[in-house]
Design a protein with these regions (language model features):
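Short S/T/G/P-rich N-terminal loop/turn motif that feeds into the first structured element of a domain
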Residues: 5-53, 105-125
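A generic structural micro-feature
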Residues: 16, 63-65, 90
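Short hydrophobic/aromatic beta-strand micro-patches
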Residues: 25, 70-74
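Short, glycine- and small/hydrophobic-rich beta-strand elements in well-ordered beta-sheets
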Residues: 47-70, 99
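Short secondary-structure transition/capping segments
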Residues: 67-70, 99-113
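An amphipathic, aromatic/His-enriched active-site/gating alpha helix that lines ligand/cofactor pockets
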Residues: 75-105
Length: 125
């Protein structure tokens, strides 16, 4: 009975791979038309999923500022995230920057576990 209870509890746990944020800036001559942009996206995603089948793509956005795109994905480890960034960089003739991220609810859980007196810097001081 105890084993069955433990197994059910384990299966109910939501275990996520690490989350990564990928910022991408395309080379100025990489895309010359909307159709070329769509082809580039399809081919880049095909290559990424073929080489890194374990990733989970969560979201992608066009952004204003020094980068063109912001993508959020989960990968089993930092090496796989680096491979994703490299594939995007090479295939899309792009510059990339990759950040590890902690989802906000999980971050709050982590902070709650800190000892009293620890100052949590949020950049909002």
């Amino acid at each position: 009975m105890a084993l069955r209870h433990w197994r059910a509890a384990f299966e109910a746990m939501e275990v996520h791979m690490p989350t990564f944020v990928l910022l991408t800036r395309l080379a100025p001559d990489a895309v010359r038309s909307p159709q070329a942009l769509e082809r580039l996206e399809r081919e880049a995603m095909r290559r990424v999923h073929a080489e890194c089948p374990d990733i989970e793509w969560l979201n992608n956005c066009a952004v204003l500022g020094p980068y063109d795109y912001l993508d959020i994905f989960r990968a089993p480890d930092v090496e796989t995230a680096a491979k994703v960034a490299t594939l995007i960089r090479v295939h899309g003739r792009a510059q990339t920057e990759t950040w590890a991220a902690v989802e906000w609810d999980r971050y709050k859980e982590l902070v709650r576990g800190l000892p009293d007196g620890v100052i949590v810097a949020t950049g909002q001081e």
